[in-house]
Protein backbone atom coordinates (compact mmCIF):
# COMPACT_ATOMS: atom_id res chain seq x y z
CA UNK A 1 0.00 0.00 0.00
CA UNK A 2 2.86 2.39 0.91
CA UNK A 3 4.63 1.65 -2.37
CA UNK A 4 1.43 2.28 -4.33
CA UNK A 5 0.92 5.61 -2.51
CA UNK A 6 4.50 6.69 -3.34
CA UNK A 7 3.93 5.82 -7.00
CA UNK A 8 0.77 7.93 -7.09
CA UNK A 9 2.55 10.95 -5.53
CA UNK A 10 5.44 10.54 -7.98
CA UNK A 11 2.99 10.40 -10.89
CA UNK A 12 1.27 13.59 -9.72
CA UNK A 13 4.60 15.37 -9.34
CA UNK A 14 5.67 14.40 -12.85
CA UNK A 15 2.30 15.55 -14.15
CA UNK A 16 2.69 19.02 -12.66
CA UNK A 17 6.17 19.35 -14.13
CA UNK A 18 4.79 18.29 -17.52
CA UNK A 19 1.91 20.77 -17.32
CA UNK A 20 4.30 23.57 -16.37
CA UNK A 21 6.49 22.73 -19.38
CA UNK A 22 3.45 22.76 -21.67
CA UNK A 23 2.42 26.14 -20.29
CA UNK A 24 5.90 27.48 -20.98
CA UNK A 25 5.99 26.16 -24.54
CA UNK A 26 2.67 27.37 -25.75
CA UNK A 27 2.95 31.13 -25.88
CA UNK A 28 6.23 31.67 -27.72
CA UNK A 29 6.11 34.47 -30.25
CA UNK A 30 9.24 33.29 -32.07
CA UNK A 31 8.25 32.28 -35.61
CA UNK A 32 10.55 30.20 -37.81
CA UNK A 33 11.01 33.19 -40.12
CA UNK A 34 14.23 35.15 -39.58
CA UNK A 35 12.46 38.50 -39.29
CA UNK A 36 10.86 37.38 -36.01
CA UNK A 37 14.28 36.49 -34.58
CA UNK A 38 15.66 39.89 -35.56
CA UNK A 39 12.69 41.65 -33.97
CA UNK A 40 13.38 40.06 -30.58
CA UNK A 41 17.19 40.14 -30.70
CA UNK A 42 17.66 43.70 -31.98
CA UNK A 43 15.02 45.48 -29.91
CA UNK A 44 16.34 48.45 -27.89
CA UNK A 45 14.75 48.39 -24.46
CA UNK A 46 15.72 52.03 -23.88
CA UNK A 47 13.41 53.10 -26.74
CA UNK A 48 10.34 51.35 -25.36
CA UNK A 49 7.64 52.99 -23.30
CA UNK A 50 8.68 50.98 -20.26
CA UNK A 51 6.19 52.55 -17.90
CA UNK A 52 3.20 51.45 -19.98
CA UNK A 53 4.68 48.00 -20.58
CA UNK A 54 5.36 47.48 -16.88
CA UNK A 55 2.01 48.65 -15.53
CA UNK A 56 -0.57 47.59 -18.13
CA UNK A 57 -1.63 44.32 -16.45
CA UNK A 58 -0.30 44.82 -12.92
CA UNK A 59 -2.58 42.98 -10.47
CA UNK A 60 -3.80 40.35 -12.95
CA UNK A 61 -4.65 36.98 -11.37
CA UNK A 62 -5.55 33.68 -13.06
CA UNK A 63 -6.58 30.57 -11.11
CA UNK A 64 -6.55 27.12 -12.76
CA UNK A 65 -7.88 23.72 -11.71
CA UNK A 66 -5.38 20.91 -12.30
CA UNK A 67 -7.38 17.95 -13.61
CA UNK A 68 -6.94 14.35 -14.67
CA UNK A 69 -10.09 13.46 -16.58
CA UNK A 70 -12.97 14.70 -14.43
CA UNK A 71 -10.96 14.59 -11.19
CA UNK A 72 -9.51 17.84 -9.80
CA UNK A 73 -6.08 17.21 -8.25
CA UNK A 74 -5.24 20.75 -7.11
CA UNK A 75 -4.80 24.24 -8.48
CA UNK A 76 -2.31 26.64 -10.08
CA UNK A 77 -2.32 30.42 -9.55
CA UNK A 78 -0.69 33.08 -11.74
CA UNK A 79 -0.18 36.64 -10.42
CA UNK A 80 1.14 39.76 -12.18
CA UNK A 81 2.87 41.70 -9.39
CA UNK A 82 4.16 45.25 -9.01
CA UNK A 83 7.29 46.04 -11.11
CA UNK A 84 10.62 45.88 -9.25
CA UNK A 85 14.23 46.93 -9.82
CA UNK A 86 16.73 44.32 -11.03
CA UNK A 87 20.35 45.13 -11.92
CA UNK A 88 19.53 48.83 -12.03
CA UNK A 89 16.45 48.56 -14.29
CA UNK A 90 12.73 48.35 -13.63
CA UNK A 91 11.41 44.95 -14.71
CA UNK A 92 8.21 42.86 -14.66
CA UNK A 93 7.59 40.55 -11.70
CA UNK A 94 5.19 37.61 -11.86
CA UNK A 95 4.52 34.50 -9.80
CA UNK A 96 3.14 31.06 -10.61
CA UNK A 97 2.30 28.49 -7.94
CA UNK A 98 0.95 24.94 -8.22
CA UNK A 99 -0.36 23.00 -5.22
CA UNK A 100 -1.30 19.32 -5.10
CA UNK A 101 -1.41 16.81 -2.25
CA UNK A 102 1.99 17.03 -0.50
CA UNK A 103 3.43 18.89 -3.49
CA UNK A 104 3.96 22.55 -4.32
CA UNK A 105 5.92 24.43 -6.98
CA UNK A 106 6.44 28.19 -6.50
CA UNK A 107 8.07 30.48 -9.07
CA UNK A 108 9.02 34.18 -9.04
CA UNK A 109 9.70 35.41 -12.56
CA UNK A 110 11.54 38.60 -13.52
CA UNK A 111 11.36 39.75 -17.16
CA UNK A 112 12.39 42.72 -19.31
CA UNK A 113 9.90 45.52 -19.91
CA UNK A 114 8.48 45.48 -23.43
CA UNK A 115 9.99 42.19 -24.63
CA UNK A 116 9.05 40.03 -21.60
CA UNK A 117 12.25 38.05 -22.11
CA UNK A 118 13.09 36.27 -18.83
CA UNK A 119 15.98 37.68 -16.80
CA UNK A 120 15.78 35.76 -13.54
CA UNK A 121 13.59 32.99 -12.10
CA UNK A 122 13.54 31.76 -8.50
CA UNK A 123 11.81 28.43 -7.98
CA UNK A 124 11.04 26.36 -4.88
CA UNK A 125 9.72 22.79 -5.23
CA UNK A 126 8.38 20.94 -2.21
CA UNK A 127 7.70 17.24 -2.76
CA UNK A 128 7.23 16.11 0.84
CA UNK A 129 9.54 15.51 2.59
CA UNK A 130 12.04 16.87 0.04
CA UNK A 131 12.73 20.53 -0.81
CA UNK A 132 14.60 21.80 -3.87
CA UNK A 133 15.51 25.38 -4.81
CA UNK A 134 16.31 26.40 -8.37
CA UNK A 135 17.82 29.70 -9.51
CA UNK A 136 17.86 30.66 -13.21
CA UNK A 137 19.77 33.64 -14.66
CA UNK A 138 19.35 34.57 -18.32
CA UNK A 139 21.89 36.50 -20.41
CA UNK A 140 19.75 37.50 -23.39
CA UNK A 141 22.73 39.14 -25.15
CA UNK A 142 24.85 35.98 -25.09
CA UNK A 143 21.83 33.61 -25.26
CA UNK A 144 22.89 31.67 -22.16
CA UNK A 145 20.97 30.31 -19.19
CA UNK A 146 22.71 29.49 -15.90
CA UNK A 147 20.77 27.11 -13.64
CA UNK A 148 21.73 26.41 -10.02
CA UNK A 149 19.87 23.60 -8.22
CA UNK A 150 20.16 23.23 -4.45
CA UNK A 151 19.04 20.26 -2.33
CA UNK A 152 19.99 20.62 1.31
CA UNK A 153 23.65 21.70 1.36
CA UNK A 154 24.42 20.33 -2.11
CA UNK A 155 24.31 22.63 -5.16
CA UNK A 156 24.96 21.93 -8.82
CA UNK A 157 25.33 24.40 -11.69
CA UNK A 158 24.50 23.99 -15.37
CA UNK A 159 24.94 26.43 -18.26
CA UNK A 160 22.76 26.17 -21.39
CA UNK A 161 23.75 27.95 -24.60
CA UNK A 162 21.26 28.66 -27.38
CA UNK A 163 21.32 30.27 -30.83
CA UNK A 164 18.80 32.99 -30.00
CA UNK A 165 16.68 34.54 -27.22
CA UNK A 166 15.65 32.09 -24.52
CA UNK A 167 12.10 32.05 -23.17
CA UNK A 168 10.72 30.44 -20.05
CA UNK A 169 7.62 29.97 -17.96
CA UNK A 170 4.46 32.00 -17.62
CA UNK A 171 5.64 35.30 -19.12
CA UNK A 172 5.05 34.24 -22.73
CA UNK A 173 1.31 35.10 -22.98
CA UNK A 174 2.26 38.76 -22.68
CA UNK A 175 4.30 38.55 -25.89
CA UNK A 176 1.30 36.97 -27.61
CA UNK A 177 -0.87 39.88 -26.49
CA UNK A 178 1.11 42.28 -28.68
CA UNK A 179 0.24 40.46 -31.92
CA UNK A 180 -2.45 42.64 -33.59
CA UNK A 181 -4.15 39.84 -35.54
CA UNK A 182 -4.35 36.06 -35.35
CA UNK A 183 -5.81 33.86 -38.08
CA UNK A 184 -6.19 30.10 -38.51
CA UNK A 185 -2.94 28.74 -39.93
CA UNK A 186 -0.74 31.21 -38.03
CA UNK A 187 2.25 29.48 -36.43
CA UNK A 188 5.16 30.14 -34.11
CA UNK A 189 8.28 28.33 -32.88
CA UNK A 190 8.97 27.57 -29.24
CA UNK A 191 12.67 27.95 -28.40
CA UNK A 192 13.04 26.41 -24.95
CA UNK A 193 16.30 25.55 -23.19
CA UNK A 194 15.85 21.84 -23.92
CA UNK A 195 13.62 21.54 -26.97
CA UNK A 196 11.92 23.34 -29.84
CA UNK A 197 8.30 23.02 -30.94
CA UNK A 198 6.14 24.54 -33.64
CA UNK A 199 2.76 25.80 -32.48
CA UNK A 200 -0.06 26.25 -34.99
CA UNK A 201 -3.40 28.05 -34.64
CA UNK A 202 -5.75 25.32 -35.86
CA UNK A 203 -9.25 26.70 -35.20
CA UNK A 204 -11.53 29.18 -33.41
CA UNK A 205 -13.95 27.61 -30.92
CA UNK A 206 -16.36 28.39 -28.08
CA UNK A 207 -15.11 27.04 -24.77
CA UNK A 208 -17.16 26.48 -21.60
CA UNK A 209 -15.12 26.64 -18.39
CA UNK A 210 -15.73 27.05 -14.65
CA UNK A 211 -14.80 30.72 -15.21
CA UNK A 212 -17.45 31.17 -17.92
CA UNK A 213 -17.91 30.86 -21.68
CA UNK A 214 -15.24 32.21 -24.04
CA UNK A 215 -14.45 32.33 -27.73
CA UNK A 216 -10.99 30.83 -27.97
CA UNK A 217 -8.07 30.34 -30.32
CA UNK A 218 -7.17 26.64 -30.40
CA UNK A 219 -3.44 25.88 -30.80
CA UNK A 220 -1.81 22.48 -31.40
CA UNK A 221 1.85 21.55 -31.18
CA UNK A 222 4.14 19.74 -33.60
CA UNK A 223 5.33 17.24 -32.45
CA UNK A 224 1.96 16.49 -30.88
CA UNK A 225 2.58 17.12 -27.18
CA UNK A 226 -0.27 19.41 -26.11
CA UNK A 227 -3.24 21.60 -27.03
CA UNK A 228 -3.87 25.14 -25.83
CA UNK A 229 -6.91 27.45 -25.88
CA UNK A 230 -6.43 31.25 -25.60
CA UNK A 231 -9.25 33.80 -25.36
CA UNK A 232 -10.03 35.43 -28.73
CA UNK A 233 -10.10 38.98 -27.40
CA UNK A 234 -7.57 41.71 -26.67
CA UNK A 235 -6.57 40.07 -23.36
CA UNK A 236 -5.44 36.76 -24.94
CA UNK A 237 -5.97 34.89 -21.67
CA UNK A 238 -4.62 31.30 -21.47
CA UNK A 239 -7.87 29.41 -20.82
CA UNK A 240 -7.04 25.72 -21.03
CA UNK A 241 -3.95 23.55 -21.55
CA UNK A 242 -4.18 19.83 -22.27
CA UNK A 243 -1.28 17.40 -22.39
CA UNK A 244 -1.20 14.54 -24.89
CA UNK A 245 -0.82 10.90 -23.88
CA UNK A 246 -2.69 8.43 -21.66
CA UNK A 247 -2.48 10.55 -18.46
CA UNK A 248 -4.46 13.46 -19.93
CA UNK A 249 -3.56 16.11 -17.33
CA UNK A 250 -5.18 19.49 -17.97
CA UNK A 251 -5.13 23.07 -16.66
CA UNK A 252 -8.60 24.67 -16.78
CA UNK A 253 -9.22 28.32 -15.88
CA UNK A 254 -11.40 28.65 -12.79
CA UNK A 255 -11.11 32.40 -12.13
CA UNK A 256 -9.80 35.53 -13.84
CA UNK A 257 -9.32 38.96 -12.29
CA UNK A 258 -7.69 42.04 -13.77
CA UNK A 259 -5.90 44.53 -11.54
CA UNK A 260 -6.19 48.32 -11.52
CA UNK A 261 -2.42 48.90 -11.90
CA UNK A 262 -2.21 49.43 -8.15
CA UNK A 263 -2.72 45.75 -7.36
CA UNK A 264 -6.39 45.96 -6.36
CA UNK A 265 -8.60 43.41 -8.09
CA UNK A 266 -11.71 43.68 -10.24
CA UNK A 267 -13.66 40.81 -11.79
CA UNK A 268 -13.14 41.11 -15.54
CA UNK A 269 -15.21 38.30 -17.01
Range-by-range predicted roles:
Residues 2-17:
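N-terminal Sec-pathway targeting helices
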